[in-house]
Structure formats: structure tokens, C-alpha cells
Amino acid sequence: MNIRMGTKGKRPLRSLTPRDKIHAIQRIHDGESKASVARDIGVPESTLRGWCKNEDKLRFMSRQSTTDKMCADALADKLDVSTGLLGPPEKRQRIDPSLPLNFSNKMKFDELGFKRAPLNGLDYSTNKNISELNYNGLAVDYVGFNGQHKVFSGDINRPANPSPNAISPLSSLTHLSGLTGLSQSPLAISFNELTTNLNLLAQLNPSLAAMSGLNSFPTTANNLRNSKPSVQPPLQVQSPRSDSGDRTPGLSVKNWAKQKPLSAVSSDVSCSINLTIKNEAKGGDIKSPSPSIAPSHVGSIISLSNLAEDPLLYWLKSQQTMLGLNSLYPPMGMTSPPIRSSTPQHIIQHAQTPPLPSAPLTPSSTPSGSLDEKNVAWYNWCKVFGASLNTLNPNSATLAALQANSLQHQHQPISAVSDGTDIADTSKGPFDNILYSHLTKESETPSVRSLSSNEHNQLDQIEGDEVTDPDLDAEIEGDVPGKPEDLSASAKRITPSQSPIASLVPESHTTEPCAKTSTTPSDCISRPGSVGGDCKKILDNMLYKIGGIKSHMPTIVDTACESEASFINEHNQHSNNNDISASNNNNNNSNKTDEEEKAKYLDLTGDNEDVKAIRHGEKFLQWLENCSNPRVTAVQLMQLRFLIAAIKSSNEPQVTEKPNKDLLENEENTEEDSCRNKIRRRK
């Protein structure tokens, strides 16, 4: 700062560099007033305001002027905190060393070297070179972390000085936000220490071992050109100081790309960052990594060390044990090709005691062949915990448990299903058929059941003749005492009613695909002494009794169903009548009353479906509250709870209004009937 005196009696003129102006602006950003800063540097306050307006231009000029003057002395001055802060000691800003760097306001570019708090763990006490900066918290042996002993090519045997073509990709961090040079970056320590920190972390956390390959691109490229890597003994972690006393590289990471894995599997897997070599008898071909979620311990018994190394597998196993689902998981002794992964994995040949017991394979937990035999554990977890989402049935998790228990009681042999492109197994047991029949039964809508035109009724007569199974009719009608066997065309397919009482069976008719699909599992359901019959009773109880459907609704629905059947029969009898006037005169009254009953039935079934849907939603909400899936959040549960409550409250006034509507309709019907009778009497 040069002070020049102009004419007498005037304020001394100061020629300030752009850097000095930037520091004055920074003091204003830090909270000082413009007046105090202007008084401190001897500049009018209006001039200082002009500098603040042209701050960007001044910063550009400051960068242009300082890049040419970079030298070791300036670097040492910037690294020394005592001289880095401007002003006399009483005006210096107190900086708490424990606080992080202050990046507030418009702080950027070169003033970071002055405004920075001393980084924790680094020794800035003397003017040292960057390569000599030590870590205070570590022992003296860790001075091997400096740049002279740094290994940049992934070879731990030879120390190498960094050359521009071997510099780690972390060197691009020095160019953040337009920073030029190490002196003006917040990372005043060199990137060598950053790569060393990654190596140290990789030793402490084996999951980060692949990150140690950040600085081994040349070696990786050389290894990928060779079809078979050179066999070396497995490299161990070296001690920081050898017995002879001379310095060695402090901590080194195992070079997985050069090491032959201990495996009896038919291929050698060599893992680096993102490239995988698979050496087989045919020759080495490079395959792109497929990130597999499943753990890579298939092919051997899982050891405790490998279980701890894979956090996803550990979490899966803990959830499995907590819910008592070990019996649904397959044993890990299956032979399969090694898994391509982006992280190096141990494949241990000798068997150890498994940490968690596993039961033999069940058909429900068999992996499908389309999964490439590697996503076994993850696939089974999705199958057990996501069963309700897959089958749209809230009770299917209970079904899975029932299925496993009954299969264990029957001592069925292990059957591996290999062709499974679908989630459901192709070889369906009786339980799958029961679930399928319940799903198809619930999917029928009243609109399908209540077709009223003559053409549809005649079409359904033809389809009923084709589809109706006499064995099924005989079995179901055998359950209903006092009802004669009717195999005529008017007897449509019989489905269980919406009530838990098995003796009330309404008659309804469906379209052809529903009838065909739901007659297939009939022999499994109707067998009285089999496990399927017991499971059918359990399913009926779960689907209807637990739901707590109102006691008066089933009887109303049944009477409505019977009236609908009578309406269909009468309508079919009069469909062949060619005299339109006679049919209108004779059947006008009966047709009108039947249509009204049919409309009432549709309203009741609509309400019944709403109630059932709300109850299923409440069950699903209760299941979500008890499940341990990490993706389910409290906000989602609250939203679902409010949604169900809103639908529930909107349905309640409709239920109360409907009896009044029914009374009014009955009165109108009686009035119309009396009017017709009077007209007929006059004739």
C-alpha cells in the first residue's frame, strides 16, 4: 500500500491494488460497517461503495494479477494463519479452529486462503512444504503418507513420484469454482493426502476397497490386456515400520486386480473399479459389471466375516430372523456361477458353521431361472414381504406361512422349478388354486352378473350349456339339503355368496372366461378330507368373518339374488313370445317389480363392495404399521389413514339415506299398481 502526498491540505492518496480492494469488500461482507473500513484504509466511503458495486470486476483483476506472482514465499504466507489475517492484532477477527470453513455470502476465489480457519489435524506451525504436512493425531510412523512415499500406480512394491499422467482424478478438485493452484483452494493440502485417506478408509471398511483403485488406472488397463493375471500370494497389510527400521509405505490396500481369488469355482474373478475379468477355459473376455443386489456368497456357506462385510445381507438376515421366516429361505449351499459385482468379494471354499439356520427349499421360495440364479435371497425376500402387493390380497402373507407349514407336515420332496418368468410358480399347489379362485370370485362385478337383455340371456344359456360342469354342480348342490339337482340351461354357474354361511348359495351367471378359469380348481377345493378343504374354511373365515360384515346384509343380498334369478327365468320364458301387446299386458306388473328389486340389489352390492374395500384398506393399513420395510414412512401411513377416513365418512350418509329412498319407491309402486288395477276394472 503506497501512500502518495498530493497538493498541500488534501487527503493523502493511496494506490490500492485490486487485492486490497477485495479485502476491504470482504471485511464489509463479514459485518463491518463501510464507514469503519473506509476510515481504516484511508479511503472515502463513497469510493468504497463504488468498489462494492464493481466487485466482480475487481475479483477478476485480482486473479489476473496474482497468478503471475505465485511463489513459495507467498504460499507459505498464506498457509501461515498468523500472517494471513489482515490488520493489526486488535482488529483481527477471532477464528474458532473447531468451526468449519466459512463459505457464507459472496466468499469465493482467492480470499479463501486468507479467510480459512486452520484445518483440523494439520500442522501449520512452521513454514513447511505441502508434502511435509503431518497429521497431528496420528503416530510419527504415519509420516509415510506424504507425497514422496505415495503410490500412484497401484503397485505397492515401488514408490513413485507423481507425474502429470499418473495423477489421481481427485486433482480435479483443485479446479473447483475456478480455483487456480493449490494456494487459492480450500483444499490447501494436496490431493495426495486425500487419496491416502481413501486408502486408510478402505482398510477400515472393506466395503470401500474398490475406491482404492481410484489411482490405479494404468495398472488396471495393463491387467485387462492380459487374459490371466500373474499369480501372487495374497497380500497382507504391512506394518507401518518394518523390523529393519527403514520407512515403508504405511498402509497399503490389497490389489484385487493382481490377486488370484481362493476359489474352487470354474472361473477366476478379478475385480477393479468398474471392470470385471472373467477368465474361463475358453479365454478371458471382459464383461460389463451387472450390479447385483443379492449377496455374492452363493456357492459356499456364509461365514460370519462375509456376513458382516455385506450390510444388505446382514439386514436381510436380521429381518428374516426377527420375523421367524428362516424356513422360507433356501440353503446357501447351491452351486452357481460367481456373481459379477463392482466390489471385490471373498469366495471361501471351506465350509463354516452358518450363522443362521435355514430349512430345505420349498416350492414357494424356489428362484426362477430368469433371475440368472443369483438374486436368490433378494427374490425370496420380495416374495415373502411383497406377497400382498403381488397378489392384491392382504391375507397372502398368512397364506405363505400356512403353505410352508403344511408342506413341512406332508414331507414333500424338494422340487426346483426352473422355468419361471412369472412370479407365481407354474406348478400350482392346492393353496395357489384356492387363492386364485378367491381372487377370480371377488373380481366379478354385479354388472356382469346382472345382464338384463334377451340377447345376453340367450348367449349365457348357450355358454352355460358349454361350460357347466355336472360334477361341480353335483358337489355344490350336495352341500345344500332339500334342493333338487337342476342341469337345465337356466341354472347358471354357482359361486359362493358374500356371507360366511355356506348353505346360502345364490345363483348367478358370468361370462365365458370367468367360468372357464374358475372351474379348474374345483376338484382341489371341494375335496372334503384334503388339506385344501381345511384351507378353504380358513380362507372363508379370514375373508369374511374377520371383516365383520353386518349380519343383516347377507340375507338381503341372498333374497335379492333369488329374486334376480326368478326375474331371469321369467324373462327367458317370455322372450320367445311374438305377440308384443300380449306380453306387455300380461307381464307388465311383474317385470316392473322385478326391475325395482334388481335395482335395489345393485345398490346393496355396491354398498357391500364399498364396505369391503374400506375394510381391506384398514387391514392393509394395519399390516403396513406392523411391517418392517424401510421404504414405508410415517407420512405415507398418515396420508393413507386420512384417505380411508375420508372415504368412510363420505359413505356413511349414503347408507342412512337409502332406506328413505326405498320407502318412497315402495309407496310410488303401490300407487301405480292401484291405478293400473282401476284402469283394468273400468275396461
Curated annotation (Swiss-Prot):
GO terms for cellular component: nucleus. It comes from the Eukaryota. This is Protein distal antenna. PANTHER family: PROTEIN DISTAL ANTENNA. It is found in: Nucleus. Residues 7-58 form the HTH psq-type domain. Its main location: nucleus. Residues 34-54 bind DNA. GO terms for biological process: antennal development; compound eye development; regulation of DNA-templated transcription; segment specification. Residues 338-352, 445-460 have a biased composition (Polar residues). Residues 220-255, 336-369, 443-525, 572-597, 652-683 are annotated as: Disordered. One of its GO terms (molecular function) is DNA-binding transcription factor activity. InterPro entries: Homeodomain-like_sf, HTH_Psq, RD_transcriptional_regulator, WH-like_DNA-bd_sf. Probable transcription factor with a role in the retinal determination (RD) network. Regulates ato expression and is required for normal R8 induction and differentiation. Danr appears to repress Dan expression, but Dan is required for Danr expression anterior to the morphogenetic furrow (MF). Dan and Danr lie downstream of so and require dac function for highest levels of expression. Residues 462-478 have a biased composition (Acidic residues). Residues 227-242, 575-591 have a biased composition (Low complexity). It comes from Drosophila pseudoobscura pseudoobscura (Fruit fly). Keywords: Developmental protein, DNA-binding, Nucleus, Phosphoprotein, Transcription, Transcription regulation.
